[in-house]
A protein has these predicted regions:
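Conserved oxyanion/phosphate-binding beta-strand-loop segments in alpha/beta enzyme cores
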Residues: 182-245
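Collagen/collagen-like triple-helix sequence repeat recognition
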Residues: 23-61, 66-94, 102-114, 120-124
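C-terminal motif of bacterial Sec signal peptides marking the signal peptidase cleavage site
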Residues: 18-21
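Regulatory N- and C-terminal appendages and interdomain linkers associated
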Residues: 24-42, 146-202, 479-542
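Middle-to-C-terminal accessory/interaction subdomains
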Residues: 213, 217, 335, 341-392, ...
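Internal "kinase-insert"/substrate-recognition segments embedded within catalytic cores
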Residues: 225, 230-231, 245-246, 266-271, ...
């Protein structure tokens, strides 16, 4: 340690050895052993553990695990930074050392002790410090970084290199509405092969706007329709895809979290989705969620178009065929888009009979009309996320297959969930407490809805509590899932919020900005955790 301190006190090291390094072309000649070499060797012999190296003007500072430092001046020993590039191959050609393609005038002599040898080639990589000595020794310092740590770091870097979507429209045309497709080409690159073995896919397509209120926000959501079906990022082949902007969600994760909950609950279909970075006509647009568009197909809403029905509950009622049930639930036909008069009459009567059964003296009469398990799963996710749209008002999707009951088939649209809504009724508030789906009707005022009327049935409550308890262990893993997903977005989110200021807001719609991505993610985790444990008690007290 005395020699180490003596070395640190040295103001300048005068002896020079020119070493071939990463990209260096100098010839190395054997001269007087450089000062500082023995101090570095003593640190190695003492078992000091390498932590990091930092190049500064004319020197390199080596830090060990005990935070002691050793300064190596470049005029003494050249220590090369190979953290971002491979080190040179070091071999012996005859009796002479060879670094890369250059043979050095340093003899390889194994009879010489380490103390009397010369450093031939020194470098540090992402793990530790290496020293090749003229006596054929390769000294590798112990490191605070294990192979497992390095593998995890490499995997994280790979995961953070999220796919890139480049959209080129014909003639650079803009995308101005939700009706007319603009022709162009889409290219999806996945250099890290995160989701498939295909690094790049390029295809002709049309693109238009999508969404309801989200279309009016600065960061635009889009729908893409390929000319031919194609697998994208490991998702089943199809023509139709959605690019969700998540402008209102400053974590960029709430839809991803909701689909994880959908997987846990086992809905008949969970839309697959991946975070991507998007460029439109070479202009960066930010982080989007590329996902399967909701539609009837064998890999999505897998029903028979000839005999079955696919419905959407949506207060905007922007499809061709719409109506309201006797309880005022705003319904739309998604498939068929234009039903026959007989089909329309059948469906309206079906929902009227269902709602009449909800008020029946027979509290279990509703079971003749609905797949109870799917409604329980729907309720659990909507209540857990405290979804302002989830009270049979918006973005709710049901199917009626021939010979089967009404089923809550899949989930959709969760950007204003988990504490991110700025317009909850004052009686429920935006905090993690209080029921919302259970107590509020589709017009967002306290009143009857399909779920709370089912809760009149003791058997329904028993099933609900049992299902909740079964799902709870998986629900408790979600905070770690959020942390993982946020870590994967760590680099991309910075670029997103350079493009879209994180402090921007959509008036009263969104929860106010917290000022940083880290705070937004922490808030999401805290809200979810508090909501989970509040509901755990509240549901079991029903």
């Amino acid at each position: 340690m005395y020699r180490l301190r003596s070395f640190l006190a040295s103001a300048f090291l005068t002896s020079i050895i020119c070493l071939a390094g990463c990209g260096e072309k100098e010839t190395v000649s054997e001269k007087e052993q450089p000062r500082g070499y023995r101090e570095l060797l003593q640190a190695y012999d003492a078992g000091m553990v390498y932590k990091s190296a930092e190049h500064k003007p004319a020197c390199c500072v080596i830090t060990f695990s005990d935070n002691s430092k050793l300064t190596i001046f470049d005029s003494a020993i050249l220590i090369h930074d190979c953290t971002a590039s491979a080190p040179k191959e070091v071999t012996v050609s005859g009796d002479w050392w060879q670094v890369g393609e250059r043979i050095l005038s340093i003899r390889a002599d194994s009879s010489v002790s380490d103390e009397d040898a010369f450093p031939v080639y020194c470098y540090y990589d992402r793990k530790t410090l290496h020293m090749y000595l003229s006596n054929r020794q390769h000294l590798v310092f112990p490191s605070v970084v294990s192979d497992d740590d390095l593998a995890e770091e490499e995997e994280l870097a790979r995961r953070q290199n999220i796919p890139v979507v480049r959209i080129e429209t014909a003639g650079g045309a803009g995308i101005y509405d939700k009706t007319n497709y603009v022709r162009g080409t889409i290219t999806i690159s996945d250099p890290g092969k995160l989701y498939s073995d295909v690094e790049e896919l390029s295809a002709p397509m049309g693109i238009r706007g999508r969404g309801n209120s989200t279309w009016g926000w600065p960061k635009k959501p889009w729908k893409v329709k390929l000319d031919e079906k194609a697998e994208i990022l490991g998702m089943p082949a199809d023509k139709e895809w959605a690019l969700l902007a998540n402008y209102a969600d400053r974590t960029l994760l709430r839809n991803v979290v909701a689909m994880k909950l959908s997987e846990i609950c086992g809905f008949s279909w969970t839309p697959k989705m991946h975070s991507v970075e998007v460029y439109l006509n070479n202009e960066y647009q930010g982080v989007y969620t590329l996902c399967e568009h909701k539609k009837v197909s064998s890999s999505r809403v897998a029903i028979d178009k000839k005999t079955d029905f696919y419905f959407e509950i949506e207060e905007n009622q922007d499809e061709t065929t719409v109506w309201k049930t006797s309880m005022g639930v705003p319904m739309m036909f998604s498939e068929p888009e234009v039903p026959t008069p007989e089909q329309f009459d059948y469906v309206r009567q079906l929902f009227n009979d269902f709602e009449k059964a909800l008020y029946s003296d027979d509290v279990a009469a509703y079971e003749d009309y609905v797949d109870v398990d799917s409604f329980i799963n729907y309720y659990i996710v909507q209540e857990l996320t405290k979804n302002v749209d989830g009270n049979f008002r918006k973005s709710t999707f049901l199917t009626k297959e021939q010979g089967k009951k009404l089923e809550m088939y899949h989930l959709w649209d969760f950007d204003l969930t988990l504490g991110n809504c700025g317009y909850f009724d004052w009686r429920v508030g935006n905090g993690p407490q209080n029921f919302f789906i259970k107590d509020f009707a589709s017009n967002c005022t306290p009143g009857d809805n399909w779920i709370n009327l089912m809760m009149r049935d003791p058997a329904f409550l028993i099933k609900l509590k049992s299902r909740w308890d079964a799902l709870m262990p998986e629900f408790e893993k979600i905070p770690d899932f959020i942390k993982e997903q946020a870590l994967y977005l760590d680099q991309a989110q910075k670029r997103n919020f350079q493009r879209w200021n994180i402090r921007e807001s959509v008036d009263w719609v969104m929860f106010p900005s917290l000022g940083s991505y880290e705070k937004e993610v922490d808030y999401l985790i805290d809200f979810y955790t508090d909501r989970l444990y509040w509901l755990d008690g509240a549901i079991n007290d029903l």
